């Protein structure tokens, strides 16, 4: 974590005129735009990484690099206050305001703070771009159900479950393709962590927490076709238990308690 935080400090440039740090000349997290400045997902990820390094150092009693704090505190993340949404990157043209399918991922996994309106609008912009331009690569839609649960939108959860896998299946064996297009991307993609996170952190409403290891941050919600979800042998800090989501309620079976801390 120290090395990663040091990297983001070295990669950031201080803009004296605007009193902020910027990350310039990057490939967007969506991989579709090259040589852009202040990609939203990149900068939000850098902030979270720096803050995790700071907190980890404090817990371990290690020195905290003051540059981590300064850079995280003044890192620029483009935001359209009039429209209440995050664009893909600084200066993205109006027609491309959120073509980046990865932009909603600043909600999850980066947990960048924002209003519910900004989260909803940014997500809807991405969904509109998918409808117009195609489904994009698997990385982003696989995590969309997490954002849908955060918004508490049942119809959106149902829609995002289908979006997260169906466009990427290829016959005759339903192999996973990296992209939604019928050809041109990697076939038999085996990185299934995005899909797995839907069930561990998405429909349960859980997030990692410093105090308990894991705690409930959002209301648990299942896609309509799924009536019950059981996660068995969850082990956190020496405690082993099962998690059950049923009827939009979450129960813990076994371990030291029967209720996840809210």
Residues covered by each model-derived region:
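Short, well-ordered loop/turn elements at secondary-structure boundaries
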Residues: 17, 100-101, 238
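Non-catalytic C-terminal accessory modules of carbohydrate-active enzymes
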Residues: 155-262
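Structured loops at beta-to-helix junctions and adjacent beta-edge loops in soluble globular domains
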Residues: 26, 109-111, 246
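Solvent-exposed, flexible loop/coil residues
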Residues: 25-31, 36, 40, 45, ...
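The feature captures the catalytic groove of carbohydrate-active enzymes
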Residues: 6-70, 248-253
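Active-site core of glycosidic bond-cleaving carbohydrate-active enzymes
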Residues: 39, 43-47, 51-198
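A glycine-rich phosphate-binding loop feature that marks nucleotide/adenosyl-phosphate handling sites
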Residues: 24-26, 65-75, 180-181, 215-225
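Structured mid-domain segments that build the active-site/substrate or prosthetic-cofactor binding neighborhood
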Residues: 1, 6-11, 123, 130-131
């Amino acid at each position: 974590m120290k090395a990663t935080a040091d990297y983001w400090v070295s990669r950031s440039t201080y803009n004296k005129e605007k009193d902020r740090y910027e990350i310039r000349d990057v490939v967007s997290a969506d991989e579709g735009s090259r040589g852009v400045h202040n990609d939203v997902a990149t900068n939000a990820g850098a902030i979270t990484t720096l803050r995790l390094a700071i907190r980890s150092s404090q817990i371990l009693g290690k020195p905290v690099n003051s540059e981590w704090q300064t850079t995280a505190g003044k890192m620029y993340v483009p935001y359209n206050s009039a429209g209440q949404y995050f664009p893909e990157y600084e200066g993205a043209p109006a027609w491309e305001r959120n073509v980046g399918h990865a932009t909603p991922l600043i909600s999850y996994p980066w947990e960048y703070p924002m209003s519910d309106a900004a989260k909803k609008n940014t997500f809807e912009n991405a969904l509109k771009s998918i409808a117009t331009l195609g489904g994009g690569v698997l990385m982003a839609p696989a995590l969309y159900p997490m954002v849908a649960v955060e918004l508490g939108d049942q119809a959106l959860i149902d829609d995002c479950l289908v979006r997260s896998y169906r466009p990427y299946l290829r016959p005759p064996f339903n192999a996973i393709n990296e992209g939604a297009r019928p050809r041109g991307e990697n076939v038999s993609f085996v990185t299934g962590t995005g899909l797995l996170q839907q069930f561990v952190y998405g429909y349960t409403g859980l997030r990692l927490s410093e105090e308990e290891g894991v705690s409930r941050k959002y209301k648990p919600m299942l896609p309509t076709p799924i009536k019950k979800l059981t996660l068995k042998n969850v082990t956190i800090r020496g405690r082993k238990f099962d998690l059950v989501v049923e009827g939009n309620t979450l129960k813990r079976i076994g371990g030291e308690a029967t209720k996840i801390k809210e």
